[in-house]
Amino acid sequence: MIEFSLLTKITLSFTILFLILSIISIIKGWKNRFQFIGVTSFSALLTISFFVFTFVPFTHKLIPGAEKYKVVFDDGANQIVIAVSSKLNQDQLVATLEQAASDLFSPGRLSRNNNSFIIKARALSDSIGTTNNSLYLGELDKILDSNTNDFETKIKIFNDSTL
């Protein structure tokens, strides 16, 4: 894990060093004084960026009981279809849908005047001879309440339905 507070201290010390060199170069009229000013400005920008990153949590939420999934369709907005194993029980399916929602949701997905984010889970079933059918196992619908700016999560589990 990157320690942004340590990076902030290191880049701050370089910024101060280049600031001192910039001031000296301006006073003495060195030819490369504008290069020192540019390096000082860039290192100040890096320092500010690392300082801001110290406040942003970079954690990955793990849902207990979630199984592996594969994204098979993503429209880039509010609909995603994932493929899961057909041997999942109901608790594992719910956990996997919640894990996919945690991994794949971002606020930008709600930008097309739609306040819901839908993840559908499918599995392949070979119950009919040699052809594989896609089973629609369940869906998670994350709905934004525009009055309170909170999300309501609805999970539907389907039994023996096919698409």
From Swiss-Prot:
InterPro entries: Uncharacterised_Ycf51
Pfam families for the chain: DUF2518
Principal location listed in the UniProt entry: plastid
Domain of life: Eukaryota
Subcellular location: Plastid, Cyanelle
Keywords from the UniProt entry: Cyanelle, Plastid
GO cellular component: cyanelle
Similarity comment: Belongs to the ycf51 family.
Protein name, entry field: Uncharacterized protein ycf51
Gene: ycf51
